[in-house]
């Protein structure tokens, strides 16, 4: 078994940096009445997906969580999915 690491240097894997989907020129506004937009940031169990997975900025994640909670309170979104 030959050691390939000595003959070939391994290149590090560079992951593309994710950008916030709510920042930019034509980015959608976070609104508690926009149920279709909010459902993209809720897991199939009904939990809010963390920003490290969705790449939403910290400020927009707080706005998103507030909008989801407001929509749940008004009955537009379910609290849990069975």
UniProtKB/Swiss-Prot annotation:
* The keyword Transport belongs to this UniProt entry's keyword annotation: no
- Pfam families under this entry? Ribosomal_S18
List the InterPro entries. Answer: Ribosomal_bS18, Ribosomal_bS18_CS, Ribosomal_bS18_sf
Q: Does the keyword RNA-binding apply?
A: yes
Listed under GO cellular component are: cytosolic small ribosomal subunit
Q: Which UniProt keywords apply?
A: Ribonucleoprotein, Ribosomal protein, RNA-binding, rRNA-binding
What Gene Ontology molecular function terms does this protein carry? small ribosomal subunit rRNA binding; structural constituent of ribosome
User: Biological process (GO) annotations?
Assistant: translation
Q: Where are the transmembrane segments?
A: none
Q: What does the similarity note say?
A: Belongs to the bacterial ribosomal protein bS18 family.
Function text:
Binds as a heterodimer with protein bS6 to the central domain of the 16S rRNA, where it helps stabilize the platform of the 30S subunit.
What is said about its interaction partners and assembly? Part of the 30S ribosomal subunit. Forms a tight heterodimer with protein bS6.
* NCBIfam families per the UniProt record, alphabetical: S18
Q: What is this protein called?
A: Small ribosomal subunit protein bS18
Q: Which organism is it from?
A: Agrobacterium fabrum (strain C58 / ATCC 33970)
């Amino acid at each position: 078994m030959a050691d390939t690491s000595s003959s070939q240097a391994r290149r590090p894997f560079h992951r593309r940096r994710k950008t916030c989907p709510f920042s930019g020129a034509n980015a959608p506004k976070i609104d508690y009445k926009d149920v279709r937009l909010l459902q993209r940031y809720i897991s199939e169990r009904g939990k809010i997906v963390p920003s490290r997975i969705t790449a939403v900025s910290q400020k927009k994640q707080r706005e998103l969580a507030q909008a989801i909670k407001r929509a749940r309170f008004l009955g537009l979104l379910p609290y849990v999915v069975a």
